[in-house]
Amino acid sequence: MQPTEDLPRGTPLSSTGHPLPRRTSPEQSVTLRHHQLARDASLKASLGSAPPNDSNENSSSPRRASSGESHETGQSDAKKWFNQSNQNPTATFDSNAMDVDPPFFQKESDSSNEDKPYQFPPATIRIQSNARSSSADDYRSVIDDLTVEIQKLKEELKRYKQRGPDMLRKDKLFEIKIHGLPKRKKRELEATLREFTATLEGSPNTSSSKRNSTTKPSRHATRDRMYSGSGSKSQSKHASSSSGSHTRPVDSAYASMSTGAGSSGTSLNRPQGGSRFKTNEQKVDHYLREIPEGLYPRFVSMTEKEKKKLVVRRLEQIFTGKIGGKHVRRTQPTLTPAVSIALPAVQATSIDFSPQQQQQQQQQQQQQPKSNFITNPGATFSSVPEPLREARILPQEHQYGHVAGQKGRSHDIGSASNSNEDQTESGGNGNSSSNGNDSGTNPSPPMPPPPEQRPTRPRDLDPDRIQIPSENMEYIRHLGLVPPELLTNPPERTSFDFHPDEEGWVYLNLLCNMAQLHIMSVTPDFVRNAVVDLSAKFQLSPDGRKIRWRGGTDGTKFSSESSGDLSQRSPETDDTENTKGDNHKRQKTGHSTGDSGSSGNNLPKFGGPQVSASSESFHYKPLFLHQQSPNEQSSMEDGTLSSFGPIEESNADSRWGQSGSGASNRRKRRRDGAIIYYSGAPFCTDLSGDPGDTSPATYMLSSERERPDAQGQFARPLPFRSGSGSSITRRPLSDAHLNLGSIPKLQLLNEGVSIPELVTDSGDESSKLSMEFPWSDEPQILEVRPLEPCGLGGVRPEDHFMVVVTTRRSKLDARVGQRLEGQRKLSEEMTDIVVNRLATMSTSSPRPSVRRLSNMSDSSKIKIEYLSGRIKRLEPVSLPPPAIFFPPFSADSCSEDDFGSDGDDEFNSSEEFMSRRANPHQSDDYPDGVDLSSGDEDGEEPEDDIDASRMVDDMSLPGLGRVPRGSQASTEVVPGSSRGRSNSASAEAVLRAGGSSAATAGGVESDFSISSSQG
């Protein structure tokens, strides 16, 4: 480097002569000089403060003394710290001093002892400050996460919130959104909420401010009364815990919850009073003694098949009341009729028992006195009934305003079953479900309304409890969506015979919850697979959301249950149900749906007449769900309909995934709007609307009646899928390696079209061909796929026909040797191609001609022989409802085929042009994929083998002949070519009259056109 005296003269240069960058030497650097001065000052300050650190070693830490006697003050002063830092800036370079000397240092002390010096040891101070800072950081992270989550929720609420009219916004009470609720239930809910809001203050003119000012004190008073039992205790507890403590104050909510079992029970429940509520002296040991074994965790190793069997048994137990299997607890829990403790006098006054029934009731009460006390230790034998566990299900008379006091009371008693301790049927202690039916023949004085609901006990949730099918059916019927008055010509039936869905469909999610399948940790897809694979009593809907019981009193019998250790019902269950059946036979005086023995009369009605499921189920996951309704709406819009039309029975067991139903639900969810109610207003604003324009009664027909014909035209057939998931019926490129016999035969969905069996002509030529080349003569059933009218092309609804072609094709599975030979030829051809390309690249010569794979294609193509063909006229299709009307552009407008009339004189003559003007519905070209001519390229005319007696409309297709063995199977006809017109001149008029008709090669599939008129 150059010496320093040369630097001011100009730019410094390096040893090589290049100018150095714009920077000064280290000796003249201002930054380095300041750093050196600061380092020297910090060293002097540390050496000068060392003696005070040694003298005050016990009072403060050495690191705190470096900031200048800040340890002498009891609490740091921000102003003093700021002045001291400015006066002694060199001390700030000490990292140790900056770590422990923040501007605000607050001691952990109360206001009463602020003047006392801070005398904690240094180590203790460091530990406490670190702990405090770490806990604060933890809470800060939680608070930040919650803040971000709240912001996201607010944004989402703004996105989904729908504002009503601005003038009514100040009087807005609340808004609701309805998802999947049927129309009738939605109307009932809207009417109830309208009446509630209109009569909230008794006058529509009442302002919202008055209502809020009058209702708020009453709400606060009610809340104060509810929490008055534990208010004083919680306050005293909170005061004692917070006084004199140096920890964080305890939140009042946690303080009220931590006051013990007694106070927590009274603070969260309703106010005490009367003998109907339990006392707070119930011990924990009694509660633990009530927990059944089924609620304890079971570590049982099961295979997937065994778990599927258990799932099926749980679901079938709801309808049969029986369960078996090696993984089920063999000893069923002892039936503890807890209702009999509190209702002996009630039952004696409301029901007239025979002497035998009274004797059995007394024997049962004597056999289980201890278990009753364990189940309900606070209960006493009195005439006051115990609160019911379940919500009361009022009879139909009460729901429509009729007075039926005794029937409602007896039915309320019967609705308290479905729990393990409330099973009064099995022990013979009166048929609870038949009480509602026997009330007409056993008159008794009306009873007062039952008390409030009691809390759910652990025994009520026992998964191994014996299910009562009648009570389960009554619970499902109560969730029914179709009243009898909405049905056309409703049959004469009682309220107990009415089904929630006339076809018996119940939501699978409901049955999974009733069977408590969540304990087994199974997914809904696993439950669907288990039902489809193993159950013989359930039928799954095509969308997989609903399930139907086929009827009967016995569940599915598995092959493993034939052994002695696995039975369908346990011995104790057998004895119980036999006793139950005998008691019901004695107690029946009218209609009864009491036990599983008599439930056979009702279960077939619930399920309806069932048709056996199709043996061929779809093992694919569809990309799109083809809806059956004309407006493409989800089936959950009407809760009673899962699917209708002929697709329901043929594809009942199809295992559909969640993509189809999920897409329909998402499509419907976007249309869901809010229903806004206003204060004192007799109306509401409904932004959701009514999806669909079809009456609900249309879909609520039972399976016994005939369905309307209007639904048939909207029922779309499900697409056919091959083994690999393709929707193409015949795959000419890959069927050579497959077995054609594995393709399932398609059913003819359109029953109005009768297609005769397709047979071959018996001739000498065909017999000669069969000697050296095998042919397949098996008749096949064609699939008729209806095409919706689109209104394009100028065709009319009468142009609805189908081309039926009889073909004969070879059996490709017998040509394994030729396939291997073709592969060898293919390898030779590829070798020649590579050699030719290499020769072209090396010599730069013109590319030689490459041999085509004509020999290969001739030896491996599919041989199809057309034997006969005919035109089948179909019924005209109905036009879709017009969306918008387009008037004609001009009066003398013709079809779009006229635009190409004067374009090429070689292919369009004046006669053809005039014929098209005479018939404007003709088309210049053939539809795509149509092959009605099979002549070879030498111009050979095909033979005419069409039988005139088999023609429907006296129209022939002479172009359908035989294909020679050496020619290509499907000769493509170029649209508008002379060869295409010459070979099929007689069929031209037929094809042009119908728009698009197709006869696929092989006769596997035949498409037809459904056309509509313009506009």
From Swiss-Prot:
One of its GO terms (cellular component) is cytoplasm. It comes from the Eukaryota. Keywords: Biological rhythms, Nucleus, Transcription, Transcription regulation. It is found in: Nucleus. Residues 895-909, 934-946 have a biased composition (Acidic residues). InterPro entries: FRQ. Residues 1-138, 183-285, 352-383, 402-465, 544-614, 629-668, 706-728, 895-1015 are annotated as: Disordered. Residues 49-68, 203-216, 228-267, 356-368, 431-442, 590-600, 976-1003 have a biased composition (Low complexity). A motif (Nuclear localization signal) lies at residues 584-588. Pfam families: FRQ. Residues 82-95, 369-383, 556-570, 629-643 have a biased composition (Polar residues). Residues 443-453 have a biased composition (Pro residues). GO terms for biological process: circadian rhythm; regulation of DNA-templated transcription. Residues 69-80, 107-117, 454-465 have a biased composition (Basic and acidic residues). Circadian clock component involved in the generation of biological rhythms, in particular in rhythm stability, period length, and temperature compensation. Behaves as a negative element in circadian transcriptional loop. Belongs to the FRQ family. This is Frequency clock protein.
